[in-house]
Amino acid sequence: MSGLLYALLIIPMIGIFFILSFDSYNFNITSNNSNSGSFSEAGAGKNSGGELLKVLVINNELNFYKKIAFITTIMNLIVSLIIYILFDFSTNQFQFVQDALELSVYNIYLGVDGLSIYFVLLTTIIMPIALISNWNSITHNIKAYLIIILLLETLLLAVFLVLDVLLFYIFFESILPPLFILIGLFGSSNKVRASFYIFLYTFNLKCKRAKYRGSPKALVTKVQHESVELAWLMTQGMVKSLVDIWVIAVLSHPCLRTESKQEGVKEQRVDGSSSSRNLEFVRCTLVAGKPVLGRKIHHCPCGPASSKLMKVQGYYNITTQAATYTHPLSTLDPWFITGFVDAEGCFMIGLTKSELYRSGYQVTAIFKISLRRTRKDYTLLCQIRDYFGIGIITKHGETTLQYMVRSIKDLNVILSHFDAYPLFSQKRSDYILFKQAIVLIKNKEHLTK
């Protein structure tokens, strides 16, 4: 039983070898006499008995190729059924593990687990069904069709059996060329276009929005509806406050720059633009240490910084009064609020359209919690609003609700809560930078000179 997995890969290759080994018959149809191999006409018209015999022999030959391919797939199905019967579902370890002799400097390991065994069985079931369903519909390039089918079976099984990441990637990408040819040659309408589509889609060549990583000013990624370009924002000096925020983050205490990673914390999306009614702003990510969109902010292993005084050397001293704030209408535990914001909350600095400013934009600090538009989530957002006694709940799209706090006065209540009940995940770094940004806004140091 030690070679069952190798048999799954070798049997289709043997079938390909047999199909390639049998050459087409050569027919020399002449019109001399019966002794020289000629055939007399069998009926009216231009059809001769020799041509009829040639067609019959060719059909028999093509059926012979199809039978070889079908028998090959059936043999593979039998082997996969044996593996399935002998598979021990009581363990989560790889089974039937086999290693090949060393090839150059690389070893090949095969094995199946409780998940891949079903894909192996499904592949070996689909292949004979595919051959039967196209037994009479494929009338040209029969040998090429059968060889591609058997080659695809080998590559698919290799994807599910190999235990090496590199070989998994190689076999997975190797499926694309034969699949491209199979669809392009034997597909129905628009087969060429379909083959290109599946090839490009699988290669994942979709155009992605570039994330600028060259300077701190690139914290501003894109304005909603692409009405304002990043370069224009930079030349107009509209991102000065964001640059200051980044500099403060770089020079902050080492807790913000630690590389330790906390597991089990839900990660949120941090890039992209957003809009709410007539509010259009650039979604900015406050990243500790580096101005890179989408990078995780790591949690300090030594615990959160002091909530009463945080010193940023050479820039600002930010002192806050730690106060407990609980609205009498709310029954939520303060630590529940903190934990919930750790998972679902968001601290943002945005550029809001405003005609009151020369640049046409106003720097806005926003705290929000987004949930799905369900009765249960709406009730929870109402309880959070009652807890703080501030903020509004709005619809955001067709499926989302948002609890939002924007004014500096109301944000002081938010800051007081998280100073008294600090965040413990990597989102605490977001909060600290958000807090520094509010100080800049209060001191009007964010304005363009």
Swiss-Prot record:
It is found in: Mitochondrion. This is Uncharacterized 50.9 kDa protein in ND4 intron 1. GO terms for cellular component: mitochondrion. One of its GO terms (biological process) is ATP synthesis coupled electron transport. It comes from Podospora anserina (strain S / ATCC MYA-4624 / DSM 980 / FGSC 10383). Its main location: mitochondrion. InterPro entries: Homing_endonucl, LAGLIDADG_dom, NADH_UbQ_OxRdtase, ND/Mrp_TM. The lineage of its organism: Eukaryota, Fungi, Dikarya, Ascomycota, Pezizomycotina. One of its GO terms (molecular function) is endonuclease activity. Keywords: Mitochondrion. The keyword Mitochondrion applies.
